[in-house]
């Protein structure tokens, strides 16, 4: 983690529970990021917090440290039942819930607080078995949580801490009724610690959220700069006919160590995957049609470096912390301005630099003015030579529905020109 990403505030300087500090230091966390330095003094004093910060700035660790500290410092309610978790962390997607659970495991191991995970798609009985043994902190998506609550597999009457992560997306996806249903089954707002964290918190979201919070304090980091200053942004204007060849040429020239390509529809993602897989790239596909187990496996392979390229719809854009993503390609400019911020926020995380390349084609170029108005700046435009685009490209692969979305290992496919890697970089 780059030192420029951190403050001089140490976790050990706060009155955090010693076991929480130990768990953080075991993972190499000594100094706070700005959002952690702002939020922790408030949560440690029992204040509710709505935190806004760009992606990759440590929001997850801020609410996890607060949650574990609060539960260790405040005894469970006397007479608490096995099916009553003490803390509830809600996320908008299965992938984000799984990631939060993974981030919390090191704290769980040191503190002894038990974790539970609840999300739709699969694993119903496996998740239920963990819940039946009793958990302190339950992390999940609203649909599965309501399912378990209606069947009395969980009871929210002993909740001491509640967290909404990526709160804007929770509301945007229409989960507000689900959230309110869950809140109505918890103790009143003044009897629990409430936290909201997100990269974007509109006034509408804060107004709705504060209905469920107790005089929450609003904290923000770099509120006027919606895109990370370590991210180099670049824009091309291709024709529809040249768009795919431009993408493949840019990938060949940049040769990114790890990149995510976003498109607006699953069919477009499948098309991109087919071209890149045929060209010998190690590429994974992440859309809503991919089975849950396969989605998690693809994310794991991408995180470990077994895949170099991930082609995804916005299902993967929110909240996922995948380290060392060097490039993000917006094959389609998104219809939602906030999605642009979240997409390019996959790179340039934790103090590292990143590169975002967007293609403003004939179909989606009309989305650009709203995006630039929202971010507060124009995206630098680069030109390309149509005659220099790759032409020796194989026919795209057809997606095999019963197979994983991976191409051959990249190092088994010879580079097109055989030129040294450093000589393939574009100038500037």
UniProtKB/Swiss-Prot annotation:
Enzyme Commission number(s) from the entry: 3.6.4.13
Motif DEAD box: chain residues: 165-168
Location of the motif Q motif: 9-37
Family matches, as Pfam families: DEAD (PF00270), Helicase_C (PF00271)
Reactions it catalyzes: ATP + H2O = ADP + phosphate + H(+)
Domain Helicase ATP-binding residues, every copy: 40-219
UniProt entry tagged with the keyword ATP-binding: yes
Primary subcellular site in the record, as a coarse category: cytoplasm
One GO term (biological process): RNA catabolic process
Gene3D superfamilies membership: P-loop containing nucleotide triphosphate hydrolases (3.40.50.300)
Stretch list, region Disordered: 394-428
Source species, domain of life: Bacteria
Domain Helicase C-terminal: 245-390
GO (cellular component) term, any one: cytosol
Keywords (A to Z) from UniProt: ATP-binding, Cytoplasm, Helicase, Hydrolase, Nucleotide-binding, RNA-binding
Localization terms from the record: Cytoplasm
Quaternary structure note: Component of the RNA degradosome, which is a multiprotein complex involved in RNA processing and mRNA degradation.
Assigned protein family: Belongs to the DEAD box helicase family. RhlB subfamily.
Protein known as: ATP-dependent RNA helicase RhlB
Taxonomic source organism: Yersinia pestis
